Amino acid sequence: MATVMAATAAERAVLEEEFRWLLHDEVHAVLKQLQDILKEASLRFTLPGSGTEGPAKQENFILGSCGTDQVKGVLTLQGDALSQADVNLKMPRNNQLLHFTFREDKQWKLQQIQDARNHVSQAIYLLISRDESYQFKTGAEVLKLMDAVMLQLTRARNRLTTPATLTLPEIAASGLTRMFAPALPSDLLVNVYINLNKLCLTVYQLHALQPNSTKNFRPAGGAVLHSPGAMFEWGSQRLEVSHVHKVECVIPWLNDALVYFTVSLQLCQQLKDKISVFSSYWSYRPF
């Protein structure tokens, strides 16, 4: 019995020494690694033109789709804003070609990119607040920090992977419709959003439902992408979507950012798992 107790005491001493090393050394090594990765992610969002404080450079992306040539165009992205847009739309009924560009005095902020960048900045702030001079005293303290960092990273990723669901009246009321010159015809709606690593442009063609229409009017709810036949009320008119054209372009640095988010979340989880291993040995007391 004495031998068993001595072995148990020796094991406990070894575990406690390993745990102290984990708290004092490995945790800070992981935090430093996370900082480096997230700073790289943050640089992808800022895309400075000259020096870290310079304005974001402009990048041109050609819109395309394997399913339609009704819409073609080029979008110019500058950081978290669309600074220019050049769109050609071929009307299905008469093949009339419409051409629209952004007004020179306008830019369209992409809130998804702005929000994702802010969440990354918040995660970096949380990590910096626990620099190498900070001494973690308990595993629970590390878990709390990792949970807070993971929350910010998950929110950042979700902003890019989960576009907002909008109703057609919300799209119609959006300022994006008034960004173009010449002004968009009243039977067109435009929406722009981020989906994963892609910048998507959707054009909705509308037609008015006649007051004596026999169609059962059912307003469509919110959606990322509405389908032909979706109905809504705007002003005194009832309208229906007749055609939907979606084109997109890949933004390489958004893909980089998503990879950085995934790697960072994995590092956080691995550190949490290591801390939790020790808690199983000392489940009867705080660790």
Curated annotation (Swiss-Prot):
<dbReference type="GO" id="GO:0030282">
    <property type="term" value="P:bone mineralization"/>
</dbReference>
<dbReference type="GO" id="GO:0045851">
    <property type="term" value="P:pH reduction"/>
</dbReference>
<dbReference type="GO" id="GO:0010467">
    <property type="term" value="P:gene expression"/>
</dbReference>
<dbReference type="GO" id="GO:0008021">
    <property type="term" value="C:synaptic vesicle"/>
</dbReference>
<dbReference type="InterPro" id="IPR028241">
    <property type="entry name" value="RAVE2/Rogdi"/>
</dbReference>
<dbReference type="GO" id="GO:0009410">
    <property type="term" value="P:response to xenobiotic stimulus"/>
</dbReference>
<comment type="similarity">
    <text>Belongs to the rogdi family.</text>
</comment>
<dbReference type="GO" id="GO:0040011">
    <property type="term" value="P:locomotion"/>
</dbReference>
<dbReference type="Pfam" id="PF10259">
    <property type="entry name" value="Rogdi_lz"/>
</dbReference>
<feature type="modified residue" description="N-acetylalanine">
    <location>
        <position position="2"/>
    </location>
</feature>
<dbReference type="GO" id="GO:0045475">
    <property type="term" value="P:locomotor rhythm"/>
</dbReference>
<dbReference type="GO" id="GO:0005635">
    <property type="term" value="C:nuclear envelope"/>
</dbReference>
<dbReference type="GO" id="GO:0022008">
    <property type="term" value="P:neurogenesis"/>
</dbReference>
<dbReference type="GO" id="GO:0007613">
    <property type="term" value="P:memory"/>
</dbReference>
<keyword id="KW-0968">Cytoplasmic vesicle</keyword>
<dbReference type="GO" id="GO:0070166">
    <property type="term" value="P:enamel mineralization"/>
</dbReference>
<dbReference type="GO" id="GO:0043204">
    <property type="term" value="C:perikaryon"/>
</dbReference>
<keyword id="KW-0539">Nucleus</keyword>
<dbReference type="GO" id="GO:0050905">
    <property type="term" value="P:neuromuscular process"/>
</dbReference>
<keyword id="KW-0966">Cell projection</keyword>
<dbReference type="GO" id="GO:0007420">
    <property type="term" value="P:brain development"/>
</dbReference>
<comment type="subunit">
    <text>Monomer.</text>
</comment>
<dbReference type="GO" id="GO:0008284">
    <property type="term" value="P:positive regulation of cell population proliferation"/>
</dbReference>
<dbReference type="GO" id="GO:0030424">
    <property type="term" value="C:axon"/>
</dbReference>
<dbReference type="GO" id="GO:0030097">
    <property type="term" value="P:hemopoiesis"/>
</dbReference>
<dbReference type="GO" id="GO:0030425">
    <property type="term" value="C:dendrite"/>
</dbReference>
<protein>
    <recommendedName>
        <fullName>Protein rogdi homolog</fullName>
    </recommendedName>
</protein>
<dbReference type="GO" id="GO:0043291">
    <property type="term" value="C:RAVE complex"/>
</dbReference>
<keyword id="KW-0770">Synapse</keyword>
<keyword id="KW-0007">Acetylation</keyword>
